[in-house]
Amino acid sequence: MSEAIIAKKAEQVAIVADKMKAAASIVVVDSRGLTVDQDTVLRRNLRESGVEFKVIKNSILSRAAEKAGLEDLKKLFVGPSAVAFSNEDVIAPAKVISEFAKGAEALEIKGGVVDGAITSVEEINALASLPNKEGMLSMLLSVLQAPVRNVAYAVKAVAESKEDGAA
């Protein structure tokens, strides 16, 4: 191989390794068998959720995983592999891909990484069933508001009973 090709591949490995290090979550899939229309819809759904989706050679993925300190991820890079990276939302790649896989049997989830830990297909599917960040924040907010609301109702009830007693 020429030095130019080796340099280009080394650059690709470095770019992918940086993406792996920066990612909040990574989902690895086998998209073999998807139609062009299905692939287009999947990519659009991922892009709308802020997820980067790439088909990358297994040799580059393996070297990048090693460089990123994710050696155990290399076992997923067998056969055609596509990788979804999300730097912000941990749940987005799992949720979009799992939802899409329900309607497209050709899409196979191989596993992934969440906050630096290798995850199985089952863990990816469990993650996909969680609400997104906004949903979790709204649940937390409602839990935090409940005691305040109860105190307000109690104060209102006491005030109303005193008004009734004074009249």
Swiss-Prot record:
Molecular functions per Gene Ontology: large ribosomal subunit rRNA binding; structural constituent of ribosome
GO cellular component, one term: large ribosomal subunit
Keyword field contains RNA-binding: yes
Family annotation (Pfam families): Ribosomal_L10
Disulfide bonds: none
InterPro entries (alphabetical): Ribosomal_uL10, Ribosomal_uL10-like_sf, Ribosomal_uL10_bac, Ribosomal_uL10_bac_type, Ribosomal_uL10_CS_bac
Tree of life domain: Bacteria
Any one Gene Ontology BP term: translation
Keywords assigned by UniProt, alphabetized: Ribonucleoprotein, Ribosomal protein, RNA-binding, rRNA-binding
The keyword Ribosomal protein appears for this protein: yes
Annotated HAMAP family: Ribosomal_uL10
PANTHER family the record matches: 39S RIBOSOMAL PROTEIN L10, MITOCHONDRIAL
Record-stated family: Belongs to the universal ribosomal protein uL10 family.
Known role: Forms part of the ribosomal stalk, playing a central role in the interaction of the ribosome with GTP-bound translation factors.
Quaternary structure and interacting proteins, as annotated: Part of the ribosomal stalk of the 50S ribosomal subunit. The N-terminus interacts with L11 and the large rRNA to form the base of the stalk. The C-terminus forms an elongated spine to which L12 dimers bind in a sequential fashion forming a multimeric L10(L12)X complex.
Protein name: Large ribosomal subunit protein uL10
Gene that specifies this protein: rplJ
